[in-house]
């Protein structure tokens, strides 16, 4: 497989975080993944579950758990920059649907 997606690098202190653009197939798998609900993991941020960050970045789940929300917000900004179409789709899905 050829790696042709966009990459955004973010420095969080001494940590170099690589935010990757995902393929359509990886995005579909990410949305389909439905682990047991965890309030903090699933709802701390509006558009990203904490468990999604290891897929979107080079961070391990252990590294994600050790970062404060302010640092994770910077990581998520990099993920948004690398995946604008995906986050645009999420925003469109949240809009109220017109009823006929």
Describe the residue ranges of each PLM region:
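Short, surface-exposed, charged amphipathic helix/loop patches that serve as local interaction elements
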Residues: 2-100
